């Protein structure tokens, strides 16, 4: 049996690999036999836990203002070409009303790290959604906050929180973010969310500038340690108004 298939079988049976093994397996992402083996196992697990159901989420992107300056992001603070907007509380609640009538039972409030939306504003919005739709799940995706802020949102009625770690490798994190931002803080935010009882989502880009197979292996090891309820993984897509505009997009095959 070829080495990549051996590693795939090992991953299937024990649910983890060592870093060097992950790197070796990821390096064989174009090997058809290995891809088929892993794809069949992924399909088996999907069928086991979700069957053939498709779960719809009502995504409300309520602000694209952001105080951060992440080098890969189209809504980064210094992008003067971005057309900025904020939804009012009334507009957000109207979106929920329309979504509920269409059958949505999960609302995801997503936005940049916008100082306008203080803890008080977020708590008020979450409480109103919770009181109006007690049978719905409320997910937030609004970036890095203090543990106390996360606690307030949870007490107001939020159930889930999405915060992609983007990369678990310190050097790679520095390549993608300005020095004011911290990978250690990003990871601590995720741990705080877990401790507070949120269903927590992490995740990363595949093919981001400066990323190596070692970076990807460290991402997988970090996720095993964190054990989030949700993981979002997608290929890097270069944005025309960032310093990475001319970088190649990430590989869909490697992402899968």
Language model feature labels by segment:
Residues 133, 165, 184-242, 255-256:
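Conserved C-terminal portion of the radical SAM core fold
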Residues 104-190, 194-199, 206-209:
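Conserved SAM/AdoMet-binding glycine-rich loop
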Residues 81-94, 184, 215:
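Glycine-rich anion/phosphate-binding loops
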Residues 58, 96, 123-127, 150, ...:
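Generic structural signal for well-ordered alpha-helices
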Residues 39-77, 87-108, 159:
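N-terminal pre-triad scaffold of radical SAM enzymes
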Residues 26-27, 57-60, 80-83, 108-119, ...:
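Glycine-rich, proline-tolerant flexible connector loops at the mouths of alpha/beta enzymes
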Residues 1-68:
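Flexible, acidic/Gly-rich N-terminal and inter-domain linker regions that tether
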Residues 14, 42, 70, 109, ...:
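Conserved, mostly hydrophobic/aromatic
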């Amino acid at each position: 049996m070829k080495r990549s298939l051996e590693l795939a079988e090992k991953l299937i049976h024990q649910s983890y690999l060592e870093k060097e093994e992950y790197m070796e397996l990821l390096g064989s992402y174009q090997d058809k036999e290995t891809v088929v083996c892993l794809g069949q196992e992924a399909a088996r697990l999907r069928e086991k836990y979700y069957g053939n159901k498709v779960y719809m989420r009502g995504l409300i992107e309520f602000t694209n203002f952001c105080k951060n300056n992440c080098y890969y992001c189209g809504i980064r603070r210094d992008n003067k070409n971005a057309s900025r907007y904020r939804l009012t509380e009334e507009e957000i609640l109207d979106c929920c009303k329309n979504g509920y009538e269409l059958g949505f039972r999960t609302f995801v409030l997503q936005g940049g790290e916008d100082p306008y939306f203080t803890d008080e504003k977020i708590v008020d919005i979450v409480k109103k959604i919770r009181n109006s739709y007690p049978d719905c799940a409320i997910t937030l995706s609004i970036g890095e906050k203090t543990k106390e802020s996360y606690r307030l949102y949870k007490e107001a009625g939020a159930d889930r929180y999405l915060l992609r770690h983007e990369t678990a490798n310190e050097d790679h994190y520095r390549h993608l973010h300005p020095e004011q931002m911290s990978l250690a803080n990003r990871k601590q935010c995720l741990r705080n969310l877990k401790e507070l009882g949120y269903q927590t989502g992490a995740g990363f880009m595949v093919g981001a500038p400066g990323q190596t197979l070692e970076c990807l292996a460290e991402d997988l090891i970090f996720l095993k340690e964190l054990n989030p309820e949700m993981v979002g993984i997608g290929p890097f897509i270069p944005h025309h108004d960032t310093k990475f505009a001319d970088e190649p997009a990430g590989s869909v095959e490697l992402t899968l």
